[in-house]
Amino acid sequence: MPPHVTLVNPPSPSGCTGHWSITLLGLGYLAAVLEKNRYEVDVIDCQALNISFEEVKNELRKRQPDVIGLTSTTLTYKSALHIIKIAKEVCPNCLTVIGGSHVTFWDDKALQECPQLDIVVRKEGENTLLELMQKLEAGKSFGDVLGITCRKDGKIVKNPDRPYIEDLDSLPFPARHLWPLDQIRKIEDIFYLTTSRGCTFWCEFCAAVRMFGRRFRMRRPKNVVDELEYLHNTYGATNFTFCDDAFTVDQSRTEELCEEIMKRKLKIKWNCGTRIDMLTKELLIKMKEAGCISVWSGVESGAQQILDAMKKGISVEQTIRVFGWLRELGLKTAPNVILGFPGETKKTAWKTITFVEKISPDYVGFYNIATPFPGTPMYDYIMEKGWLRVTDFDKYDTATPIFETPMLSMKELKEIREQAFHHFYLRPTYILRMFAKGGMHGLSATRTALEHLLKSIKLKLQRL
């Protein structure tokens, strides 16, 4: 009888916002590949449904899977290990497997820290997990499976990496039917897709190159629009987010994708994330015609010296120009910003805050605190300098300072971030613009402004 697999998305620490919608893609692809090969698969998504550890334990006791597979970010790492320990209590003979960006670069430590963990899957997991299932079903050893780290004769063994999947079109669409979509869509009625993997850039704060390789592997436009059309026809979906790190990396492919959407007369709205230097006004016009309503981008900093230190490869001038196009075309904007990168000072941080106000986005995607995630060049640099102050991964939420430099303390950075949000949302121009849009926009702007006003007053009182 084929092995039964339960895939688990562990909960985020209390008070943290989970990225369950993105995680659905990772686990969804794994589940789809296993289902295609006739394995029984089910899912426990703790973040999507706010499931407790006790509920996970009860579900695993009831389901009794042969294999329990978890995904893990840095933020959910401790939760994932706790679930593995729970799993072995109620399913003592199950095989426990974990994958994801964090454990890819923390594989040996994960096995050391959790005796109940059997196997770490590094990097892309679809073909690796499938081979593990095939070996288990055939009663064969896992010893020669590429892309895993495991124990052998009491020692931790790291097998060679598995080659990346070259033809992403060969992957089935994520098995979204395994999720309670009716409940999820009450929270957020957006369907997420990814159209590429890998990256050719080497930003210091990002692990994409080490995780997925230093080149872009892209799905063909027809395959992507096939998925859009399937979701539209099957679930009545009309709102989509493309989760690629750089959606417009290949302009001709993006144009072809837009043309395919229009050719099929799909009445949909979508947004995407991309790099500032991978946009032209002509491309944005085409994207809008095909249903694009907003673009989020990694602005990161308004100080050129910090952008250069990040190895971001963009200029402040490029950002100003592109945001001008976006505003002119009526496309909503949401820049992601990083504060506290090594080399940051109070002066450069405030330069970024005033720069964000200058480009006048509709929303601030995030004022992220620079966080040294394992696997990133920044993590290596911070460790080399001895600047790391927080080792509890539950705090790696990009809202909490993790390290400090001689130029900026953790306390100073936390205060600057709080002031940045207050500064942005208390601007009269922002409030007036939201009121001009009318309806819920005006009410939301008022509520947001009042929240930040109260926080700003509280912050000032604390300093007295």
Give residue ranges: language-model regions.
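Radical SAM enzyme core and accessory elements
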Residues: M1-L7, E40, K57, D66, ...
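N-terminal [4Fe-4S]-dependent radical SAM core
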Residues: P2-P3, P11-S14, V145, C150-T195
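Glycine-rich beta-alpha loop elements in corrinoid/cobalamin-binding modules
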Residues: H4, W20, V33-D167, N368-G375
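Flexible glycine/acidic-rich beta-alpha junction loops that bind and position SAM and/or redox cofactors
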Residues: S14-C16, D107, F201, Q251-S252, ...
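Glycine- and acidic-residue-enriched helix-capping/strand-helix junction motifs
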Residues: S14-L27
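Proline-aspartate-enriched helix->loop->beta-strand connector
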Residues: Q64-I68, A237, P361-D362
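Structural recognition of alpha->loop->beta junctions
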Residues: K109-N127, E289-W296, K351-F366
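Radical SAM [4Fe-4S] cluster-binding motif and immediate context
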Residues: D169, F173-F341, K346, K351-T354
